[in-house]
Curated annotation (Swiss-Prot):
Binding residues annotated for Zn(2+) 2, in chain numbering: 143, 176
Protein name, entry field: Alkaline phosphatase isozyme conversion protein
Signal peptide: 1-24
Cell membrane found in the keyword field: no
Length: 345
């Protein structure tokens, strides 16, 4: 294990439906991501795991990758989650998730995985449904159409760039029901694939939060943290972009580490991760759950799963220009970072 970990660190250190037309390059960083995010949120609301909307959105993303020239396919998996009725009776809901994968081949067998979950929240109880949490009309602009948009723009801008290490773009399913798609992805990986995976980057909830955060996994070695998280923060500073890392004010979440997303699955398996999100770790329980100060536009200080709040119309009104600006900022950080880590020619 130690030798494999050392190998990954050394390898990274060396590198320091509806179809939209795919253009050679976006005029400005973030434009393509913004367009894609709005399209996905508008035309594929209610992307709950196993629903027709999720299947259609998965096929749309696959077609976008193929238009860019990538080999891309959809992998389905069967899973289930518990639903709690009003009388507290619990029952299993069976689902078939759809995960989209596209491959950017490198010269070496090592790879970097860039992930964003495509599913939106499905009500897990009658109480959720009563509170307008999840369901057929949830756009999920923040959670997580914007993450998908950024991933697609990274793929678009890297499609003709030779890299030493391969890059796999993955739109996961089932994140909202317990990281089901990420679990299935890891389960399908061979021991060799796991060993050759230098880093998993997860893009999630990029818009509503006060500022960008770059967090490592609990098990990510310090040397890799410096090459990934700390390097991302340095790039952000060079562009005057407000970005930081978890300050560690909650003892359950150590300084510089993240929580509660698909990256956790890989972190627990001993694979280095970098979580990219927008929130405010200084508020509430200081666990990253409260994204911003409580206001009439965001009464609980977040937009989590709320049909009325997590849509581009509400966000545009409450936070004018935020979607475009945040897509641009994330791209200005992530594109050079990924090029460095993958050793782009």
């Amino acid at each position: 294990m130690f030798s494999a970990l050392r190998h990954r660190t050394a390898a990274l250190a060396l590198g320091v439906c509806f179809i939209l037309p795919v253009h050679a390059s976006s005029p400005k960083p973030g434009d393509f991501a913004n367009t894609q995010a709005r399209h996905i949120a508008t035309f594929f609301p209610g992307r709950m795991t196993g629903t027709p909307a999720e299947m259609l959105s998965a096929d749309y993303i696959r077609q976008q990758f193929q238009q860019m020239g990538y080999r891309s396919d959809i992998r389905t998996f069967n899973s289930r989650y518990i639903y709690t009725a009003r009388d507290n009776r619990k029952s299993w809901h069976n689902v078939t998730g759809s995960t989209v994968i596209a491959a950017h081949e490198g010269k070496a067998p090592q790879q970097i995985i860039i992930m964003a979950h495509l599913d939106t929240y499905a009500p897990l109880s009658d109480a959720d449904a009563d509170a307008n949490l999840g369901g057929l009309t949830l756009q999920g602009m923040d959670d997580n159409a914007a993450g998908l948009g950024v991933m697609l723009e990274l793929a678009e801008r890297l499609k003709n760039t030779p890299t030493e290490y391969g890059i796999r773009f993955v739109a996961t399913s089932g994140e909202e029901e317990g990281k089901l798609g990420a679990e299935n992805l890891l389960k399908r990986m061979s021991d060799t694939e796991k060993k050759n995976t230098l880093l998993v980057i997860n893009l999630d909830n990029l818009i509503v939060g006060d500022k960008l955060y770059f967090n490592s996994g609990v098990k990510t070695p310090e040397a890799v943290r410096k090459l990934t998280r700390d390097r991302a923060l340095a790039i952000a500073r060079s562009h005057g972009i407000a970005a930081t890392t978890n300050p560690g004010l909650n003892k359950n979440y150590p300084k510089g580490t993240g929580c509660c997303n698909d990256a956790e699955i890989f972190d627990k398996a001993g694979i280095a991760v970098l979580s990219v999100e927008a929130t405010n770790w200084n508020l509430g329980n200081k666990d990253g759950y409260q994204q911003r100060a409580k206001t009439p536009a965001f009464p609980a200080g977040n937009s989590w799963h709320d049909v009325r709040l997590d849509n581009h119309q509400h966000i545009d009104k409450a936070l004018p220009g935020r979607i475009e600006r945040r897509c641009r900022d994330v791209m200005r950080i992530m594109l050079p970072l990924v090029k460095e880590l993958a050793k782009a020619s």
